[in-house]
Curated annotation (Swiss-Prot):
Enzyme class: transferase
Disulfide bond sites: none
Enzyme Commission (EC) number: 2.7.1.130
A GO molecular-function descriptor: tetraacyldisaccharide 4'-kinase activity
Organism per entry: Nitrosomonas eutropha (strain DSM 101675 / C91 / Nm57)
Protein name per UniProt: Tetraacyldisaccharide 4'-kinase
Top-level division of the source organism's lineage: Bacteria
Pathway: Glycolipid biosynthesis; lipid IV(A) biosynthesis; lipid IV(A) from (3R)-3-hydroxytetradecanoyl-[acyl-carrier-protein] and UDP-N-acetyl-alpha-D-glucosamine: step 6/6
Amino acid sequence: MNWSELYWQRITPLHLLLWPVSLLFVLFQSIRRHLYRRAILTSVHLPVPVIVVDSITATSPVKTPLIIQIVNMLRASGLRPGIIGHGYTDNYHSPMSVTIDSPLQLAGKKSLLLAYYLRETCPVWIGHDRIEVAKALLETHKECNVLICNDGLQDLRLQRDFEVVIVDTSVINSGNGLIMPAGPLRDSFARLKHSNVVVQAGHHRQIPDIGEEIRTFYITPLKEHFFNLSRPELTASAAELANKRIHAVTCDPDIQNFLDNLKFLRLTVTPYIFSEDHHFVAEDFPFDEAEIILIPEEDAVKCFNLHDERIWVLQQEYRVDLGLRTIILKKLREKFMDPKLLDILACPLCKGPLIYKKDRLELICKADRLAYPIRDGIPVMLEDEARRLPDEEEIK
């Protein structure tokens, strides 16, 4: 258990001192929401739909896998999503694209993990001002037609078309029930009434103050498996690694949880523990006798440049209720009914403009002579699904 989890579990004199600060924070957020709702404070509308995915608690291990599943769902439906997020202090001013080569101190673990898992399929951009980040991403990736904000629950300046709030009951059950800075909650449960859907992780339990009008879906852990960091297409089960000489290396603050997981998987390992702020170098892995080196997912971002094929990553798989896909696509269909939105979409191949043909329900790329279909209200921006225009067909 790391220090923050221990802090959130207790109520001490320090928590009692911070409790009035928590109440002031909630009051401040309520006033801000009221001012934005009354248009006294001005929010910014982006040209493409925005989906905010964030957690009501300070941390949630399911947020990154949930975002990845939403991205894959959108791409399978023919959409071209991009991800925006808040930057670290070191990149306070400028929006930046995140790749697996981005410095950890600039990009942060979560953004690097997203860039690693979604490389070449979904751009990831971060920066201090989410509005400017979104504009920079859309300017660079003109083919993107929907944005996912991987935080921003409390950034009311950013208009959102759909909001997914994660409620991790495993965090709440072990917490003291207080709002930051006195506890793990980032806002009161009443905030959930302003979201579109709630995704619940952990134990299935009634969430207070949510109301009956907010749909709740569940994200459920499935099996754990390992993938090779240098060759992620290679995967292995615990049984396949059981007879290997294994060293487990981590600088994750939740060290014991990682080792307990390996023990639960019946793997015998030799542990090596580094400090939380440690940056791995090749010299940290001198053990020639090790056939396999296991690391937790959070530490994978610190090993991208090592190119050691012995390094395998422990990954937890999750399943999300199918109803979440249905309700998100329903909302996006409503947005794409606006011809103004269809008129600004770009070809995913040449990045050039598309011509909206309402009578044919197609988006025409004049340069590549391709017609992308609009099916069930969703523009399907997939080359394999596009109709190749014959030479004799005139494009107007």
